[in-house]
Every structure is written in C-alpha cells, then in structure tokens.
Swiss-Prot record:
It is found in: Cell membrane. It is a multi-pass membrane protein. Its main location: membrane. InterPro entries: CASP/CASPL (IPR006459), CASP_dom (IPR006702), CASPL (IPR044173). This is CASP-like protein IN26. The gene is IN26. GO terms for cellular component: plasma membrane. NCBIfam families: A_tha_TIGR01569. The lineage of its organism: Eukaryota, Viridiplantae, Streptophyta, Embryophyta, Tracheophyta. Residues 1-26, 97-120, 185-195 are cytoplasmic. Coiled coil: none annotated. It comes from Ipomoea nil. Belongs to the Casparian strip membrane proteins (CASP) family.
Length: 195
C-alpha cells in the first residue's frame, strides 16, 4: 500500500536555472573564442618560408636566389595579427569577468551584459575587418591578378599559403563564435525586459 500524501522525486543530475545555462554557455563560448584567436595568431606568426626563386636580369642568364616570405611583409597580415591580438586581450578580460559572474558573484547583471554586447560588437568588427583584409591579400597570393600584373605566389610558397589559409579559417570560426556570443547576450538581456 502506497502512502498517501506528497512524494518527492529526486532529479538526476544538478538542476540549473535558465540564467545559469546562459552563464555556462557564455563562459564556454568565451573560452572557445580565446582558443581560436590564439591559434589563428600563432599560425599566422609562424608562417614563414624560404624558397629558391629563379631571377632573370637582362642580359645575364637566370640564376637562383633564396627569397623568404613571411607575414610581416604584408600590412594586411600585420593588421590581422594586431586586430586578433586586441580581440584576444579583450577576450581574456571578458572570460575572467564571465567566470567571476558565474562562480563568485552569482546573479544576473544587466550592466555587465550590456557592456559585453557593446564591446563584443566592436571586437566583431575588428575580427571581421582583419579577416577580410588578410583574406583579400591571401586570395591574390593564391590566384594572382593578371589585369594588374600581380603573379600568384602560392605555387612557389605552398607551406606559407597553407599557414595563411588555416589561420584565416580559424579566424572565421572565431568570428562565428563572437557572433553567437552577441546573439546569446542580446537574447538573455531581452528576457529581462518587462512585457
């Protein structure tokens, strides 16, 4: 015979409130953003290759000359490293603030979320423009431009171009993560607006 009255059931696993899900998701996304920014910068900075290139000076016969290609030879790649480094520094600070808000000072802080939204949008612009600028230069290196006489270089510097492509792909991933963070922050802030 089952006793009458209320019976408490135990839930499997911890129970999280919706705002805790937001905080945990935000912290995970910020860590993912930081990791992707660091990887993109490190891969770009380590992109350096030396190849023997045939050089012809009239009236002399062609000769082989060792030429080095590296990221510092293009202002777009320098901007890429600088922009992603700034975004990485901001991400370190915002990740620490997220963990502080998650672990030490629980509770929803609309002021912190609104500051994150504004600064995340600024960082989205920086990461987007840096990725676009570097991507444009990398594309010219890959395909060249016959109309203005720019020859492609990726057929000679394959390792360098592989590094550039990988760095740009990871940077684009960081751009998407940053966009998701902005959407998540706006959604969580909109839930606090009285209806």
């Amino acid at each position: 015979v089952a006793p009458t009255g209320s019976v408490e059931t135990e839930k499997a696993g911890p129970s999280y409130k919706p705002k805790e899900y937001y905080k945990v998701t935000e912290a995970i996304l910020r860590l993912l953003l930081l990791a992707s920014l660091v990887v993109a910068v490190v891969v770009m900075v380590t992109s350096k290759e030396t190849e023997l290139i045939s050089v012809k000076l009239d009236p002399f016969p062609p000769f082989m000359l060792p030429l080095t290609a590296k990221f510092t030879q293009s202002p777009a790649f320098i901007y890429f490293v600088a922009g992603l480094s700034v975004a990485g520094l901001y991400t370190i600070i915002s990740t620490l603030a997220s963990f502080y808000n998650l672990l030490i000072k629980p509770g929803f802080c609309p002021a912190l979320v609104s500051h994150f939204i504004i600064l995340d949008v600024v960082m989205l612009g920086i990461v987007g423009t840096a990725t676009g600028a570097a991507g444009g230069v990398a594309y010219i290196g890959l395909k060249g431009n016959s109309h203005v006489g720019w020859t492609k270089v990726c057929n000679k510097y394959g390792k360098l171009c592989t590094h550039l492509g990988a760095s740009l792909a990871v940077s684009f991933f960081a751009f998407i993560v940053l966009l998701l963070l902005i959407i998540l922050s706006i959604h969580s802030l909109s839930k606090k607006i009285p209806k």
